[in-house]
């Protein structure tokens, strides 16, 4: 399994100590403004499902509306099952859903780093990754596949940054070229940096099991975070991070 960054372990322990960890609760939406969680039927005052359409029995089996933030009103059994299936497919402990692949990229990057940290973003990255880099407030260094020596220099110069994150597409959407993932993982390990790979165009296409460019390159266990989308090869909508 991919090693967990030290700062992430420390941050989680701090939240646990302060009793601030927000668990993901499975909540079944019921008609008439009610819900069921832990076997108990309750009135649901946490949802934004004002007209009850997300829990209308006429949509049973096809309804996908969340109704509110999952951290507030819980996660539906359908979403929980999907996250478990994605985690099993990706051979990871867990997966986290987003409404789109774009949101998965922007949200994940902005959550991992912030002001004072350093991002190393490939010049050909998708706009969603670029937006995530900007939103984070971290200092962004741009690199290319042809000059990884420059990336190494930039990583060395940023050794004082609390967190360092290399961000790249696995397959670049404009030309179909694969990122040099093995070399990027070598640099990430050498300079104690996290690495995030966007598998939007790799999932279902590359790798023995269709898990993408990281699987094809044999670096799944070396990549810290992988982001995927359900709107391309999977033929649906949504995004996820593992």
Model-derived regions, located:
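N-terminal "arm"/small-domain region of PLP-dependent enzymes with the aminotransferase-like
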Residues: 4, 9-10, 14-65, 193
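Conserved N-terminal alpha-helix of the aminotransferase class I/II PLP-enzyme fold
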Residues: 64-101
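Conserved PLP-anchoring active-site segment centered on the Schiff-base-forming lysine
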Residues: 108-127
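Active-site-proximal loop->helix
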Residues: 111, 128-137
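Short, structured coil segments at secondary-structure junctions
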Residues: 115, 135-137, 191, 222
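Active-site phosphate-binding strand-loop segment of PLP-dependent enzymes
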Residues: 141, 145-197
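Active-site PLP attachment segment
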Residues: 215-242
């Amino acid at each position: 399994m991919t090693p967990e960054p030290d700062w992430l372990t420390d941050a989680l322990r701090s939240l646990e100590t302060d009793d601030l960890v927000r668990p993901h609760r499975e909540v079944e939406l019921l008609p008439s403004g009610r819900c069921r969680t832990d076997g108990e039927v309750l009135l649901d005052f946490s949802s934004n499902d004002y007209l009850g359409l997300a829990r209308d029995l006429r949509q049973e089996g096809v309804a996908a509306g969340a109704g509110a933030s999952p951290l507030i009103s819980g996660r539906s059994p359908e979403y929980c099952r999907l996250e478990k299936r994605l985690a099993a497919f990706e051979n990871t402990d867990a997966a986290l859903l987003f409404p789109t692949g774009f949101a998965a990229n922007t949200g994940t990057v902005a959550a991992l780093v912030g002001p004072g940290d350093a991002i190393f973003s490939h010049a050909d990255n998708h706009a969603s990754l670029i937006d995530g880099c900007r939103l984070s407030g971290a200092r962004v260094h741009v690199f290319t596949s042809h000059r990884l020596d420059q990336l190494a220099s930039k990583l060395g110069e940023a050794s004082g940054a609390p967190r360092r994150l290399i961000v790249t597409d696995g397959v670049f959407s404009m030309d179909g070229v694969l990122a040099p993932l093995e070399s990027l993982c070598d640099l990430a390990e050498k300079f104690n940096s996290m690495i995030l790979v966007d598998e939007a165009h790799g999932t279902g296409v590359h790798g023995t099991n269709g898990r993408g460019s990281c699987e094809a390159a044999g670096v799944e266990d070396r990549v810290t975070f992988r982001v995927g989308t359900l709107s391309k090869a999977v033929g649906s909508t949504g995004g996820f991070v593992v």
